[in-house]
C-alpha cells in the first residue's frame, strides 16, 4: 500500500524531487562542460539560471550541488538572499564554512590566517565595512582572495570542484552591494593560477570553481544595467522554459513499466504502479510546470492507498490542488508590469491562429504595431512567457490555460 510518507513527489519550494523531469541540457552543461573544463584548468563562466516562480531553477542547482558533493566536491548550501539583506555578509559566512570544510592550513600559514580574519570582519559587518574610510584594498576583495585559496586547496586534492549557489539574486537591489558581489565572484572565476607544467614551463590555469546564481527574470536587467558587458563575459545566463510533455511522461514511465518501489511492513519492497491514463492526466494538468507536475503527482498519491494510481485518483486529488495551482499562476501574472500584463491578456483573447503582433497591438489600441514590439520582446526573451513568430504562441502553457480555459478547475 502507499502512504504519504512514501510519496516521491515534492512540490515544496527548493526541494530536489525524487521524480525528476527534464532540464537535461542544464544538467549536461554541468556534467559535460562546466565541471570537466574547470577541473582541466580551462576557464568557464559562472552560470545564471533565471525563471518564473515554479520553474524549478533552485531545485535544478541544488541537484547540481548535490552531485558535486557526492563526487567529493565542496558545495555551499543554497544561499538565499532575503529582500533587504546584505549579500556580502551572507556569502562571506558561507565561504568561511567552505574554508573549514577544505581545512585550509590557517594554523601554520599566517597569510591564510590573516585572510580568514579579514573575511570574518566582512561576515560581521558586510557592505557597511566598505563604506568606512580606510586604507588598503576594499573589504569585498577578501571574498575573492578566500575563494581563490579554497580553489587552490581543491586543486591540490585533484578532481574536487568548489560550487557556490546564490539564490534569490533579484533581491540584491543595492547597486553597490550587487556590483561588489559580482566583481568578487567574477575575479575568482577569471583568476589565472600559475603552475609548473611538465617540462618546466610556467602556465596559467583556471581553478576548479563554479558559481551558480538563481533568481527571477528581472535580475538580468538589474545586473546588465550597471555591469553590462562585464557581467555577460563572466556569467552565462539561461532563462528556463516550460518542460516538454515528453519529458514529463518519461519521468513517470517507471510507474508504468516497473512500479515505484516503497518499503512494506514486512521489511520488503512493494511497487506502486500507475495507469497510463493517470500518467497522461498528471502531465496534462501540469502544463509543463515543474511545481504543478509535483503538485499533481503528490495529490494523486495521497488520493488512495492501493498500489495502483488511477486517473480517477488524479482528478480527485487535483480538486484539492486546483486553488493552489490557480494562486501560483495568478502570482506570476500579478508580478508583471501593467504593460506586459495587458499584452498577455490581449493575446489570450485572440484565437491561436490570430495571435500576431499587429492584431495584439490593435487590440491594445496602439497607434503603431511597433509600439508593442519591446513588450513582446521582453515577454519572450526575458520571461519566456510567450514565443514570437507567425503566429505568436504561449511558452508558459499554464498561463495560457488559465487565461483561455477553465483550467485548473
Region roles according to the model:
Residues 240-278, 285, 296:
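Conserved small helical "lid"/interfacial subdomain of P-loop NTPases
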Residues 284, 288, 294-369:
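Winged-helix-like regulatory helical subdomains adjacent to P-loop NTPase cores
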Residues 1-45, 196-199, 204, 409:
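A short, basic N-terminal segment
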Residues 364-382, 389:
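Short amphipathic alpha-helical interaction segments
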Residues 157-158, 163, 171-227:
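Sensor-1/coupling segment of RecA-like P-loop NTPase cores
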Residues 399-409:
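Short, amphipathic alpha-helical interaction segments positioned at domain boundaries
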Residues 224-242:
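A short helix-turn-beta junction within AAA+ P-loop NTPase domains corresponding to the substrate/partner-engaging
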Amino acid at each position: 500500500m502507499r502512504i504519504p510518507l512514501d510519496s516521491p513527489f515534492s512540490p515544496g519550494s527548493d526541494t530536489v524531487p525524487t521524480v525528476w523531469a527534464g532540464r537535461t541540457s542544464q544538467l549536461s552543461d554541468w556534467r559535460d562542460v562546466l565541471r570537466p573544463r574547470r577541473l582541466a584548468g580551462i576557464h568557464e563562466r559562472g552560470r545564471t539560471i533565471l525563471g518564473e516562480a515554479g520553474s524549478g531553477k533552485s531545485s535544478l542547482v541544488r541537484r547540481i550541488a548535490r552531485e558535486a558533493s557526492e563526487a567529493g566536491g565542496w558545495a555551499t548550501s543554497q544561499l538565499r538572499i532575503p529582500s533587504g539583506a546584505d549579500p556580502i555578509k551572507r556569502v562571506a559566512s558561507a565561504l568561511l564554512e567552505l574554508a573549514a570544510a577544505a581545512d585550509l592550513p590557517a594554523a601554520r600559514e599566517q597569510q591564510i590566517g590573516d585572510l580568514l580574519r579579514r573575511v570574518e570582519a566582512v561576515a560581521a559587518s558586510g557592505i557597511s565595512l566598505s563604506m568606512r574610510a580606510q586604507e588598503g584594498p576594499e573589504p569585498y576583495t577578501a571574498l575573492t582572495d578566500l575563494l581563490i585559496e579554497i580553489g587552490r586547496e581543491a586543486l591540490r586534492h585533484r578532481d574536487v570542484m568548489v560550487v557556490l549557489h546564490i539564490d534569490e539574486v533579484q533581491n540584491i537591489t543595492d547597486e553597490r552591494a550587487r556590483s561588489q558581489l559580482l566583481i568578487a565572484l567574477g575575479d575568482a572565476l577569471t583568476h589565472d593560477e600559475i603552475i609548473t607544467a611538465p617540462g618546466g614551463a610556467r602556465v596559467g590555469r583556471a581553478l576548479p570553481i563554479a558559481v551558480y546564481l538563481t533568481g527571477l527574470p528581472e535580475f538580468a536587467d538589474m545586473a546588465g544595467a550597471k555591469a553590462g558587458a562585464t557581467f555577460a563575459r563572466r556569467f552565462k545566463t539561461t532563462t528556463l522554459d516550460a518542460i516538454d510533455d515528453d519529458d514529463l511522461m518519461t519521468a513517470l514511465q517507471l510507474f508504468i513499466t516497473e512500479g515505484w518501489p516503497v518499503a512494506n511492513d514486512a521489511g520488503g519492497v512493494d511497487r506502486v504502479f500507475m495507469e497510463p491514463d493517470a500518467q497522461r492526466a498528471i502531465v496534462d494538468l501540469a502544463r509543463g510546470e515543474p511545481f504543478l507536475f509535483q503538485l499533481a503527482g503528490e495529490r494523486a498519491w495521497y488520493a488512495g492507498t492501493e498500489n495502483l494510481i488511477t486517473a480517477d485518483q488524479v482528478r480527485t486529488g487535483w480538486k484539492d490542488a486546483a486553488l493552489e495551482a490557480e494562486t501560483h499562476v495568478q502570482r506570476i501574472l500579478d508580478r508583471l508590469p501593467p504593460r506586459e500584463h495587458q499584452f498577455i491578456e490581449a493575446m489570450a483573447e485572440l484565437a491561436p491562429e490570430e495571435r500576431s503582433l499587429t492584431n495584439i497591438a490593435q487590440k491594445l489600441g496602439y497607434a503603431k504595431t511597433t509600439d508593442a514590439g519591446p513588450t513582446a520582446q521582453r515577454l519572450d526573451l526575458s520571461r519566456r512567457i510567450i514565443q514570437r513568430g507567425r503566429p505568436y504562441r504561449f511558452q508558459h502553457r499554464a498561463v495560457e490555460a488559465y487565461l483561455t480555459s477553465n483550467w485548473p478547475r
